[in-house]
Amino acid sequence: MTISDIARMAGVSSAAVSRYLNGGPLSEQKRVVIHEVIKKTGYHPDMAAQTLRTGRVNQVGVIAPSISSHAVGQITAGIVSELDKHRYLMLLGNTDLDERRELGYLNVMQRNHVAGIILMGSFYTPQLAQAFTNCRVPVVVTGQRFPEVPCVYNDDRGAVRELTRRMLDAGRRKIVYISGTEQDQAVGMFRRNGVQDAMNTAGLDGASLPFVSCSAFTMEEGERCMKQLLELYPDLDGVVCVTDLVALGAMRALKAAGRIVGKDVSLAGVGDNWAGSLT
């Protein structure tokens, strides 16, 4: 079974079938007809021949910082859903927040002739900037703002500013923050800036915001950081956390210390995932 056979059965040109297989422009009518023929025949294109012909395969590389993360899982599911519409496969690499793995996957995926790479950004380094410059395929970064490549990101600063404003409106004034590392701009810097912005607007000194940085976005780290903040600031009445899972760990530490969450202390995290529904 060849492209020519599919074209003959669908009543279209071989070029139309090729465009369909490669995610190219095509009328919806032709797309439906070709899809039905391929579905009926069980046709699968020869990937090796396709690579020789185009210099790439219908695969997009996705580099993730931690596949166990709820947010990463949601993003990955969305990517797969969109790739399926265009008949692309996903080649997934998990870095576990290891910069060497990140750089390694960028190289390996290019050698595997992927059509492009989606990098869920974590840390911005000179080595990564150079890798972007040298990359031979399109790269898009999610979750961070890197100058060398197109980026898709949330308004981390604005979101945490609004979250903190609501906490301040509830009367909380002794607010502390459990942060990420400075290397991670989105969660380490922009989210903390959002807390400081809200404090400044409320007439408080945002620059003096007490915070502790967690080394991983886990319950264990949230609990450890919360214990540390309770020792340093026992009269705190509000806690903003870098993620919901960190907030869940912080809640465990607050309860162990006899604090009543929602009554004598407010607690909030960023992420809107399952952890945020637990009290």
What does each of the following model-derived ranges do?
Residues 32, 43-115, 193-196:
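Amphipathic helical "hinge" segments at domain boundaries
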Residues 124-135:
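Active-site-adjacent beta->alpha loops and helix N-cap segments on the catalytic face
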Residues 40, 81-86, 110, 134-141, ...:
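Bacterial carbohydrate/catabolite-sensing allosteric modules
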Residues 96-99, 120-125, 146, 245:
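Short beta->alpha connector loops
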Residues 40-46, 100, 120-122, 223, ...:
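Short gly/ser/thr-rich secondary-structure transition/capping motifs
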Residues 14-19, 53-68, 174-181:
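Short beta-strand segments enriched in small/hydrophobic residues
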Residues 1-58:
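N-terminal helix-turn-helix DNA-binding module of bacterial transcription factors
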